[in-house]
Every structure is written in structure tokens, then in C-alpha cells.
Amino acid sequence: DGLSLQDNIEIGKQLHNDGVIDFLNLVSGKIDTLPRLTNYMPGMAAPLAPFLQQVAFFRQEIDLPIFHATRINDLATARHAISENIVDMVGMTRGHIADPYIVKKLMRGDEARIRSCVGSTYCSNFRYCIQNPATAREEHLPHIVSKNSDQTKRVVVIGAGPAGLEAARVCALRGHQVTLFEAADRAGGQVLLAGKVHWRNDLNTIIDWLEKEIQILAVDIRFNYFAEKADILAENPDVVIIATGGTPNTDWVNGNARVVNSWDVLSGMVQLTGHVFIHDQTGRNTALTVADYLSEKGVSVTLNTQDAQIGAEAMRLEMSPFMKRFYERNVELSVDHELLAAHAEDKKTRVTLRNIHTTNTSDEFVDHLIVEAGTLPNDDLFYMLKSDSANKGVIDLDLFTEGRAQPAHGESFHLYRVGDVSGSRDIHCALLDSLRLCAQI
């Protein structure tokens, strides 16, 4: 079972009495299983600063400076820990991964502009930050975007998901005049759906921060505006950035059965009861979120994937919170089966599966089928504008991946696309696209 809290206090006392230590740096937990590792490096499923009470016991027993770092994501939590005399110094490792300028912003009175860690644990998988694409890419991407020393340009961005918001933010920091069109009544795109499960709603703070920044930077954002080609050309733009995202990829399913997409479920547009079969083609968080969302409502859920494990591309430290909920709610998990077809039969849906190893087929009779296979680019507007643009919508990929400026030629506007309109990926990739492209415009 390891050392108890009291065991550790006694060890700390002995080390202090022996005079061999000057301070204590306290962490809590074990890392021998995935749930314990998740508890040791907690993400958004855990409360902020979950071990402060245990740290307080050390403070009461040992007269040494105490340092502590575990999910202290923001200065308000850090300030509480210090003001209550629980710790002498707070560690904010992931906080500084999200925003290396926490201290500088605080010192200059810009605490409200600090980009706080959301606890997605993206950094545990990829050593990058889900919301700060410059982290670990400092050799070619800036944390601080410099102002363009050349002329101010008119930049039009279409779509206020993470890619569009970041494009607008970075272009505004460059000193350009930015107009942002969004068809919906609020910003966020797919992130708003990702945060529908209550323990993951901290993802919404990514959008909150971006939206607050573009307001500070005086971006002209127009909601409830389905921008068409004429609307964009009327702005007389120098640069047009398409960030219109994608639409659910479900049309490939063979058969005549109704196929429901994840968006309609998470948005509340579709209400499902009975036995719901979810087929996941991506291994990312979306299917997991839908299974969590429905099972919490008491729906009987089967979650199937053709991968060798559920959530093969999800964040490793998010899998334990998902799996805990699935086991508690008797969600049936199925792996190694691809979806062949879905047919309507006697008010049921017959789902035909094939084992990818044996090639044996089997049928499941369910009430509803949800297919999560990512998105297809919503790129109609891009192709409407392509022939009128100076660069014909073409991007130099070598320059793009290095964060260098794209070629400037011709008298017409330059046209680019970022985020899922280029291909179905995740929040980090959408933000990375925009920073790479826009930091040198």
C-alpha cells in the first residue's frame, strides 16, 4: 500500500531533525497503474489543488519551507495556498507550459490575460500544450507575436472555432485590420460540444481566452453571419483565411439504416433512448465523450472500435476517468471490429461488424447507431474564392511547417485555410495551423 500520510510526516521530521534538508517539496500518489498515475498528475476530471489538505498536515507538523505543485492551474489558486499559509512556494509546471509569461503578466498588471492550463493532459502524450502551439517549438514559432513593420493589411477570417479565433488573434497582434465572420451566435465550434460532459467543460476556457484576446485587440467579429463570396470580396481583403471546419463524416456507411452523428447528440438536437451502438473510427475523444454523455443519462451504450483498444488516440491520462464511468454504468466495450453496414429491420438497426483479425462477421440489433469518423472539410467557400486569389489557395508547405512567411505575389488577395477545413484533426492542430501561418503575415 506504500507509505501513509503519517509515515511521510515522520520521515520528514526525521530528515529535518538530522539537518539534511532545507525544504520539503511535496507530491502525493503512486504511478504503478493508470488510475494512480492519473491521480498523481490529475487532469480536468479532478478538482483544483486536490492535495492541499494533505500538504497542510505537513505544515502543522514540520517547521520547514514547503513547496507543492499539483493542478494549481491559476494564480487565484496559488494565491489561496500561500495566503492560507499552506505552502511557501507554489509550483505551476503545466501552468507555465500553457503560458510561460505568467509572472511577467502578473508584474505588469495583466493577470486577466494569462492563459491558464485547462488540465487536458495533452502535454503528457505529446510534450506539447493543447492550447499554446508555440510551446516546445520556440525555435521557429513565437510566444510573443511581433508587429508587422510593413503595411497594415485587411484580413478576413471566416469561422470562429479555435483555428479562426487564433488566426484573428495573431493577425491582430501583427497590426492588421481583422474582420471575423461566424455563422453561429457564439464562438467555439466543436470545442463547445467537447465540453458538454461536465468534467470536461474546462475546455471551454480555451475559447474564452481566445475570444477575450480578440476583443482586447479590437477584432471586428460578426456573429450570426453566414459569409458568402460576395460578403468577403466586399471587404476588399488582402488576406482571406478560411476556418470553416468540417461536417460529420457518416455518408460512407453502407445500408439503409439511419446513422446519427456525434454532433447532433452532444448538441441536444437528437434525443436517444434504448440501446445505442457507437462506432468509433478515430480513436479520439469524441466517441468517448458521446458514450459518457449518453450513459450518464441512463442510456444503454455499446462503444465499438476497429482499434485494439478504446480511445487509442485519446490522451492517456484522460482514459482512466472515462473508463471509470464506463465500468460504473455498464457500458459495453468492443474492440477489433470494423463496421461493414447498417440496415433497418423491424424498427431496429442491424449493425454488421467484421473482426479485423479473423474476418468473421457478426450482427448486433440496436435501437440507434452513432458513427464517429471525424469530419469532412467544409471547403465550399474556399473553392469559390480559389480562382480569384493571387496564390490560387496554394500554400508553401515547407515555409508553413517552419513558421516562415508565405510568398507574396499578385495584386489580388491571398487565400489560406486552417483547421479542420484542411483535414479532421484536434484543437492543438487547429491552433498550430493558424500560428504557423499568421505569425509572419
Regions from the language model: what does each represent?
Residues D1-L3, I31-L37, N73-R79, I97-D99, ...:
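Flexible loop/turn segments at secondary-structure boundaries
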Residues Q177-L217, N285-L339, S422:
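Rossmann-like dinucleotide-binding cores of NAD(P)H-dependent redox enzymes
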Residues I21, V87, P237-D238, V366-D367:
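Local beta-strand N-terminus motif with an aromatic residue
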Residues M41-M44, N85, M107-D110, K196-R200, ...:
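Short, hinge-like loop/turn segments at secondary-structure boundaries
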Residues D1-I158, P162, E166, V170-L173, ...:
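Flavin-dependent oxidoreductase catalytic cores
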Residues S149-A183, R222-N236, A243-R316, H357-H368, ...:
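Rossmann-like dinucleotide/flavin-binding elements
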Residues L37-M44, D88-M89, V191-W199, Y416-S422:
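Short beta-alpha connecting loops at secondary-structure transitions
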Residues D18-I21, F57-P65, L210-R222, R329-E332, ...:
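A structural motif corresponding to the C-terminal end of an alpha-helix
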